[in-house]
Amino acid sequence: MDSKRSLLFMALLFISFLIYQQWQVDYNTPKPEMTEQAQVSEVNSTALTATSDIANDTQAKGRVITLENDVFRLKVNTLGGDVIGSELLNYDAELHSSAPFVLLQNNADKVYIAQSGLVGKNGIDSRAGRANYQVEGDVFKLAEGQQELKVPLVFEKDGVIYRKVFVLKPGSYALEVNFEITNQSPKPIEVVPYAQLTHTLVESSGSMAMPTYTGGAYSSSETNYKKYSFEDMEKADLDIHTKAGWVALLQHYFVSAWIPNQDANNTLYTLTNTKKHLGSIGYRSAPIVIENGATETIHTQLWTGPKLQDQMADVANHLDLTVDYGWAWFIAKPLFKLLTLIQSLVQNWGLAIIGVTLVVKAILYPLTKAQYTSMAKMRMLQPKLQEMRERFGEDRQRMSQEMMKLYKEEKVNPLGGCLPILLQMPIFIALYWTFMEAVELRHAPFFGWVQDLSAQDPYFILPILMGASMFLLQKMSPTPVADPMQQKVMTFMPLIFMVFFLFFPAGLVLYWLASNLITIAQQWLIYRGLEKKGLHTRVKK
């Protein structure tokens, strides 16, 4: 029992270390120096770049139109056709707030916009200025029962008609942004499509218990998914040539991503402007030649919304990896599927967490039973082991040999009680990242005072109950500890971890509390069986 408790203590500390280490790697980014923040409002329809062809920032402002379906409301600037605002209609800005969550925005405090255009020899989005599109109407809304809403923005120059067509579909956060180019000029033209996400340079935020990453990410033919933080952008510009792929900006629970034509050759890039305190991640395609009299359509998609794994996987390969479970993904993914399955049945995410706990504990029950049986046998051997310690004294080699001989004779595995604890470590870490990354748990209520399972318990009731359950579990297996210092550590361990869990998401604390209560029930059941065999009663003294 001593070794089991020690291992549990070390396991929890190890889990804490792994979580802290991952937080340091992904989130503890030095904050860049703020310079000329007042100039951020000048960006508006800006293309941020150091190259000579993609448009630079401009003071001019176009007309702003609104596009809306049943899940988001978008603001589009007719100067350049950039998406400069998005409101997610099914997500509250704050708990119990009636205001929708704002993802894309462009104001004096924060810039986060999705830009796209045409550069190159005959591009209309050069440094000299952006295309000033014309459109009839100001508000375009997908009607109930309508399968598709197309909103064309039109611009004409030198005999060429450029249509930037936005396509919205019901229930989808994927916005099609297509260029339809009709060349009525006497000569061929050449354009280079590009798209980028521009964001105010910020550091990742959150606490050690609930860290959040804000920064870039991309996918290429060589790399399924890789983060590229704002600090990385400031150190070196990204320059990757690939077929297919995508670029994205991530934040807690939400993501915006440009997905180019997956059959085209693209260059993924990043750019920073420290003067205006901005960073961009984007792509540009290979030049496209349009003969006179011909029409060419260039397809691209913009995802701007929550990290919904199933929907994102349908939009682009590996886009669902923006729900980042770290190294425990192979456990977290099936756990999340199980969690959503149970939630669909019980219609409560808190009950679903308890359901997942029941399944996990049921799977581990044979090992748990073996653990307590092994512990009971080990306690039976304590008098003989104590006798060996007194007999062999300082002769540790002889004592070890005799102990191994005794274990073999009694068919006892001294490490038999460790396996369930070791198996629970990666499960706990996987659940931590599942609860951290799942937007489905954002503002999801349980019962009573727990109105948001993704946030800490506001009254710390769950952590206190968890600490009490650990204390009860400890008292159910009383074993004297020889070392007084170790005895004190073990006595205070429930209190230590109660304090440790005070600021963890309520969903994670609920899992640990449910796990402890189920373990108490399992332990009582197992001990009853051991008493019938005469094992438990013989060692309780």
UniProtKB/Swiss-Prot annotation:
Function: Required for the insertion and/or proper folding and/or complex formation of integral membrane proteins into the membrane. Involved in integration of membrane proteins that insert both dependently and independently of the Sec translocase complex, as well as at least some lipoproteins. Aids folding of multispanning membrane proteins.
One GO process term, biological-process aspect: protein insertion into membrane
MF terms (GO), sorted A to Z: membrane insertase activity
NCBIfam families, A to Z: PRK01318.1-1 (NF002351), PRK01318.1-3 (NF002352), yidC_nterm (TIGR03593), yidC_oxa1_cterm (TIGR03592)
Pfam families in UniProt: 60KD_IMP, YidC_periplas
Protein name: Membrane protein insertase YidC
Keyword Cell inner membrane among record annotations: yes
Keyword Cytoplasm belongs to the record: no
Keywords: Cell inner membrane, Cell membrane, Chaperone, Membrane, Protein transport, Transmembrane, Transmembrane helix, Transport
Main location: membrane
Organism of origin: Histophilus somni (strain 129Pt) (Haemophilus somnus)
Location(s) in or outside the cell: Cell inner membrane
Domain of life: Bacteria
Subunit details: Interacts with the Sec translocase complex via SecD. Specifically interacts with transmembrane segments of nascent integral membrane proteins during membrane integration.
Transmembrane feature ranges: 7-27, 345-365, 415-435, 453-473, 492-512
Family: Belongs to the OXA1/ALB3/YidC family. Type 1 subfamily.
